Amino acid sequence: MIGACGWQHPRWLEEFYPEDLPAEWQLGYYGNEYRVVLIPAEYWQDVDLSVETWLEETDNSPLFLSEWPQDRVAGERARAGMHELGARGLGFVISLTQMPAEAEIGIYKELAGGHALVFDIGELSAQAQESALGLLTQALGENRFGICWHGEPQGQAHLALGPLALTRISAVKDHKELRRIIQTILEQSNHHRKMVLIVDGDPPDIQLLQNAGIMLDLL
């Protein structure tokens, strides 16, 4: 599945959404084009956010992944929202900038009871990444979580981990690099796992999204 990080992007009014499309229809329009979306952590800061409205605005697409907010109140809102999304909620993406504390591990254990978890450890040093993998495996269990891949050749083994494999990119050098990334994802695909490619950016590059979709169809 291919999608973007977020759908509320003002610049998409020129690049993706029709200019006269009401803001409340943007998610439905997006869902007609892409099967999955990553909810940015900051969306959960909005006290007026309504998951019920998201479901009313869309049919069966998109499915939802969510970044895990660091703020406690936003985190509780995200947890409740993912529960409300039901079968359309795929799980949480948790970014680690340092080794998680015992309290954080406790939260991850609770989340893992009902949701797929993918950890982004790209900001950690190589040594810290190995330590984090060991700690998470001890806490959550072998192959019970995924590790986000960013398209770099040396990290592709992470795609084999967990029930949900996530790749996040914001740009590629050329079509050859995009083909390599998508082929690598497909090589790890099977009927028992969900494979997701998310395009990041401010806003995410619509041309890259479209090219990725075309490339996936060709492969």
Where are these regions (language model features)?
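Residues lining hydrophobic/aromatic ligand-binding pockets adjacent to catalytic sites
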Residues: 1-219
